[in-house]
């Protein structure tokens, strides 16, 4: 399994989608897993247009509960279900996330075939996802909101001193 980390912007638009831009959604591919940060309307369609599979999402982090940051979640979860997902899904957000996801999962008539766990985060709470940790940071907005700091854990690798010199990295004690 690859340890590569890749970020894919699925939506960067404002409060509502436009013909050329989707609303907030960013996928972070870490090895074979995908973390989703916000899930605005149309996120599942943006996944289909990208090279990233929404079936590989292991965790979703919602920054706040304005529609342009979470209204894509019900459709995404139902599409995962219809596509045969069995792997668990973790969803994190600010206080109120448990009630919101419970209400979301009651929409429509379908039986969820995979487990969904929900966690509410406060400032400085940390979620350990194996290769990375995600730390919540309280944001300033008109509603309670979080930003997220993603940190990759140290891993063994190969250092190429000649390439470092070419890039202008000054020699030092860890060179």
What are these regions (language model features)?
Residues 41-92, 120:
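Active-site metal-binding motif and surrounding structural segment of the metallo-beta-lactamase
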